[in-house]
């Protein structure tokens, strides 16, 4: 589902930060300022947004994984919901250092969480004492909060989508070290450096965040649907009947 300029305006994508907090590296994407607030050039945002969505569709059609990252209060619920809708992993609470660069250690925690979930399913947790059960529950809640969104990721993602790159410098740095492409919403007070696909725009408005996250989820679903359609067509194309004549 494509996003229109009107939708971007209504979501407040064009509203940047106060002019005194600006990052000069965002100058090419700034239209001007009003009441000491920088105004983002939506014509540039639209083009760059479309380029990012094109990349995500292509990645998804090749069964790529996109990790959604948004831990600010106004982004958490949206990031989790849209990532789940697209069947993708997400980080909505806190970025743990080494989440990408030290994934081997993170996998140990994921294994522990899955073991705990299995204990609940098979009822073995019922055998714990009251004190043990309380400790079990506390540990499970803590693990769910920190890695619940990535427990089915399986490995390093093919790309990460980040809302507010300044707030998630750790994620950007780790992605850069591993050569993982970053699709990032960059407001006027942050640097676009380290972001492969820059989406210049408001990173504080919940409406704007919903627009970005919904767009990424839609692009993933479209890419997956296109891949399925291509597969069906290729199977149909291979069903042509060929008569083989018997040799005497």
Curated annotation (Swiss-Prot):
Keyword Ribosomal protein: yes
Keywords: Ribonucleoprotein, Ribosomal protein
CDD domains per record: RPS2
Superkingdom, taxonomy of origin: Bacteria
Any GO BP: translation
InterPro entries for this protein: Ribosomal_uS2 (IPR001865), Ribosomal_uS2_bac/mit/plastid (IPR005706), Ribosomal_uS2_CS (IPR018130), Ribosomal_uS2_flav_dom_sf (IPR023591)
Gene Ontology cellular-component terms listed: cytosolic small ribosomal subunit
GO function terms (MF aspect): structural constituent of ribosome
Pfam families xref list: Ribosomal_S2
PROSITE patterns: RIBOSOMAL_S2_1 (PS00962)
Gene3D superfamilies (UniProt xref): Glucose-6-phosphate isomerase like protein, domain 1, Helix hairpin bin
HAMAP family cross-referenced by the UniProt entry: Ribosomal_uS2_B (MF_00291_B)
UniProt similarity note: Belongs to the universal ribosomal protein uS2 family.
Protein name from the UniProt record: Small ribosomal subunit protein uS2
Organism of origin: Janthinobacterium sp. (strain Marseille) (Minibacterium massiliensis)
